From Swiss-Prot:
Function: Methionyl-tRNA formyltransferase that formylates methionyl-tRNA in mitochondria and is crucial for translation initiation.
Protein's name according to its UniProt entry: Methionyl-tRNA formyltransferase, mitochondrial
Clinical disorder: Combined oxidative phosphorylation deficiency 15: An autosomal recessive, mitochondrial, neurologic disorder characterized by features of Leigh syndrome and combined oxidative phosphorylation deficiency. Clinical features include mild global developmental delay, white matter abnormalities, ataxia, incoordination, speech and reading difficulties, T2-weighted hyperintensities in the basal ganglia, corpus callosum, and brainstem. Mitochondrial complex I deficiency, nuclear type 27: A form of mitochondrial complex I deficiency, the most common biochemical signature of mitochondrial disorders, a group of highly heterogeneous conditions characterized by defective oxidative phosphorylation, which collectively affects 1 in 5-10000 live births. Clinical disorders have variable severity, ranging from lethal neonatal disease to adult-onset neurodegenerative disorders.
Disulphide connectivity of cysteines: none
Domain of life: Eukaryota
GO cellular component terms, semicolon-separated: mitochondrion
GO biological process, one term: conversion of methionyl-tRNA to N-formyl-methionyl-tRNA
CDD domains associated with the record: FMT_core_Met-tRNA-FMT_N (cd08646)
Keyword terms of this UniProt record: Disease variant, Mitochondrion, Primary mitochondrial disease, Protein biosynthesis, Transferase, Transit peptide
Native species: Homo sapiens
EC code: 2.1.2.9
Intracellular or extracellular location(s): Mitochondrion
GO molecular function terms noted in the UniProt entry: methionyl-tRNA formyltransferase activity
């Protein structure tokens, strides 16, 4: 059903409402500061016309749910579904584009957003700040599926920082986009879940993507009511989750505990391998494992004073043991000039023959913290902090 109304940015008048007296839905949005008076053709209820913005695997799950809803003719939730994604150097494109093409959905590459008419926009892992002019094209605004319990972990990498900081509880927030600032709009729906012990960021993202997709469909089924009941984010508890840089992957053996190193590995290991120095050469640690108690009982590990970064090969378990601030971590494989197992690394660099005949100083035969050159990004950092305050 379509109705022609004179409105100020928000849902149409409720059925039976008197002219000149705004509906509860409109009043809720007006309190949130949206004003763009014009004549427009909008819908009071589903099916909705949706424009989806997304890029990665997390976003693809939300798009899959929207597509399934559009194909479900009995529920009549989605009438029209089109997609905006980012350009990619890969011919196949990003995961969202791949799914859109396979599903024969119209797809545009940013900044092209098409010229169709839509009721509501949906964003998931898009990575671009949407301007006010674009947001105001959607009668019901633009929703964001964000994988954290806002206001904790605003920004582009919430799942990574959830794992990196050892959070035990996380969740998904469906919020409404605001122009000029990231992740600060009103919360329409929020659900929490425990973080599975020792889960990687990739594994946690898969859990949250399914939860977020289900929550999105729930919000769309009652969109005007959800908007009317939206609540502002609290001021306290806001944290920022910046993108991960190569410098984050550099292990600080003297400063980081074994727990911190394992959290770092679970958070970013599948994106950027952890890095350190070996005899002035960068070495990547590919496969980290926890060290069991039987290995720790070895006299070689307890009978001498060790410097953080010291490396010992444990023959029985075929792993490299590396000493950090408070204990040991295990490494099964590394990348030097090529990929090496722990045994290969021992034979090439730790074997007594090599230690005897090498010109390397004993102090060099340990892992040392890699110091990458830092770029001056102070202005950008300040600007990003202002975006979330």
């Amino acid at each position: 059903m379509r109705v022609l109304v004179r409105r100020c940015w928000g849902p149409p008048l409720a059925h039976g409402a008197r002219r000149g007296r705004p509906s509860p839905q409109w009043r809720a949005l007006a309190r949130l500061g949206w004003e763009d008076c014009r004549d427009s053709r909008v819908r009071e209820k589903p099916p909705w016309r949706v424009l989806f913005f997304g890029t990665d695997q997390f976003a693809r799950e939300a798009l899959r749910a929207l597509h399934a809803a559009r194909e479900n003719k009995e529920e009549e939730l989605i009438d029209k579904l089109e997609v905006v994604t980012m350009p990619s150097p890969s011919p196949k494109g990003l995961p969202v584009k791949q799914y859109a093409v396979q599903s024969q959905l119209p797809v545009y590459e940013w900044p092209d957003v098409g010229s169709g008419e839509y009721d509501v926009g949906v964003v998931a892992s898009f990575g671009r700040l949407l301007n006010e002019a674009l947001i105001l094209k959607f009668p019901y605004g633009i929703l964001n599926v964000h994988p954290s319990c806002l206001p904790r972990w605003r920004g582009p990498a919430p799942v990574i920082h959830t794992v990196l900081h050892g959070d035990t509880v996380t969740g998904v927030t469906i919020m409404q986009i605001r122009p000029k600032r990231f992740d600060v709009g009103p919360i329409l729906k929020q659900e929490t879940v425990p973080v599975p012990p020792k889960s990687t960021a990739k594994e946690l993202e898969a859990v949250l993507s399914r939860l977020g997709a289900n929550m999105l469909i729930s919000v769309l089924k009652n969109l005007p009511e959800s908007l009317s009941n939206g609540r502002q984010q609290p001021m306290e508890g806001a944290t920022y989750a910046p993108k991960i840089s190569a410098g984050t992957s550099c292990i600080k053996w003297e400063e980081q505990t074994s727990e911190q190193i394992f959290r770092l590995y679970r958070a970013i290991g599948n994106i950027i391998p952890l890095q350190t120095l070996w005899m002035a050469n960068t070495i990547k640690l590919l496969d980290l494992v926890e060290v069991n108690s039987s290995v720790l009982a070895d006299p070689k590990l307890t009978g001498q004073a060790l410097i953080p970064g010291s490396v010992i090969y444990h023959k029985q378990s075929q792993i490299l043991l590396v000493y950090c601030k408070d204990g040991w971590i295990g490494v099964r494989s590394v990348m030097l000039k090529k990929s090496l197992t722990a045994t290969d690394f021992y034979n090439g660099y730790l074997h007594p023959w090599y230690q005897k005949n090498s010109q390397a100083q004993p102090s060099q035969c340990r892992f040392q913290t890699l110091r990458l050159p830092t770029k001056k990004k102070q202005k950008k950092t300040v600007a990003m902090q202002q975006c979330i305050e």
